[in-house]
Swiss-Prot record:
The active site is at 37 (proton acceptor), 271 (proton acceptor). CDD domains: PLPDE_III_AR. This is Alanine racemase. GO terms for molecular function: alanine racemase activity; pyridoxal phosphate binding. Pathway: Amino-acid biosynthesis; D-alanine biosynthesis; D-alanine from L-alanine: step 1/1.
Length: 377
């Protein structure tokens, strides 16, 4: 890859540490699906997957076909599940690349089966059950049992898994999450009563792993799906404050100062007259902008770390560049700037940036552009 003056630094030791944290919580005989959608939440899907597989991951989880195909080109034998919706038009690519798909309707299952039979193959599928998130899935009721019987009878499919998704397991009060698991477990018991079993049964995301593995709600589960915790973040501030598990920061957004210029008093910096120089101002220009994932709204709102000093980000963030004020800062062209990342360097971490923008760290890191090089340390 061509070098740029901005990049995402990824701490591989932290990736390994966080995966080990998952292994220390889930049952010893459990399978682990490392969720690496959205370019591994910004960390780089190929390298992150390689590390998780080395550490013992049994499965990889993504959201869409393009993500799955990228992984398949590097990991020809690794099980890969597309957790999101797969259009019928994608069926042949799912089959040809030995990918597993999420299914939630008989109609789609029939299309997938027909396509698989034409290829003289079988497509692996996982059935999605909606236990209370009300997004996608079959309802956990008698009608769905009949639907599942019909899906399992389709000769072009291998129904290897069944799963649900917890919508609120990161809350302080776990009532909704426990009710979801109660519904899922009851449904699994009804299926077992009719001798319907699955190789994989899964429900716990990071929030479930961190907060619900000490009860018996997971008694039927044998596969766990860690996501955000692998990249060093807790699913919510409540969990961060109460959870004994230590997670380590993985991602830092960095850029070099490409030019330093002195701007006289009484000038505006950047687009739209959003920063006025009320004194002679030393301005450092960074080759990093909102097209790279540095939110435009952060201009005039955060401080960045330069040589263990804090300097304000000024003006509006441009598409490809931004500005820092260097008055009283020891810095030169080529010096490294940490926009967010490891707090040991005085920088904000992604959760603090997210709080400032009234969002979550998932968004802060997963929107980091692929045009930024990932540098692994």
């Amino acid at each position: 890859m061509l070098k740029r003056a901005s990049f995402v630094e990824v701490n591989t030791a932290s990736l390994r540490h966080n995966f080990s944290a998952v292994k220390s919580i889930v049952p010893k005989d459990a399978h682990i699906m490392a969720v690496v959608k959205a370019n591994a939440y910004g960390a780089g899907a190929i390298k992150a997957s390689e590390i998780f597989l080395q550490e013992g991951a049994n499965y990889l989880g993504v959201a869409a076909l393009d993500e799955a195909l990228e992984l398949r080109s590097h990991f020809p034998k690794t099980p890969i599940l597309i957790l999101g919706y797969s259009p019928n038009a994608n069926a042949s690519m799912l089959i040809d690349n030995d990918l597993s798909a999420m299914v939630f309707s008989l109609e789609q299952a029939e299309v997938f089966s027909q396509m698989a039979l034409k290829s003289q193959k079988r497509l692996k599928v996982h059935l999605k059950i909606d236990t209370g998130m009300h997004r996608l899935g079959l309802e956990p009721n008698f009608k769905s049992i009949e639907t599942i019987k019909k899906i399992r009878a389709l000769k072009g499919l291998e129904v290897e898994g069944i799963f649900t998704h917890l919508s609120n397991a990161d809350a302080k009060i776990k009532t909704h999450a426990k009710n979801q698991m109660k519904a899922f477990n009851a449904f699994l018991e009804q299926l077992l009563d009719q001798k319907i079993e699955f190789q994989y049964r899964h429900a716990y995301n990071s929030a479930g792993i961190l907060s619900l593995c000490n009860g018996n709600e997971n008694r039927f589960l044998n596969l766990y799906r860690p996501g955000i915790m692998l990249y060093g973040f807790y699913p919510s501030n409540e969990m961060k404050e109460s959870c004994p598990t230590i997670l380590k920061n993985v991602i830092s957004l960095k850029a070099q100062i490409v030019q330093i210029r002195s701007v006289k008093k009484g000038e505006f910096i950047g687009y739209g007259e959003h920063f006025y120089t009320n004194e002679e101002t030393l301005v450092g220009v960074l080759a990093l902008g909102y097209a790279d994932g540095l939110m435009r709204a952060l201009g005039n709102r955060i401080q960045v770390a330069i040589n263990n000093q804090l300097a304000p980000l000024i003006g509006k963030v441009c598409m490809d560049q931004c500005f820092v004020k260097l008055n009283n800062i020891q810095a030169k062209e080529g010096d490294e700037v940490i926009l967010f990342g490891d707090k040991s360097a005085k920088a904000n971490d992604a959760s603090e940036i997210a709080a400032l923008l009234n969002t979550i760290p998932y968004e802060t890191i997963s929107t980091l552009s692929k045009r930024l090089e990932r540098v692994y340390i």
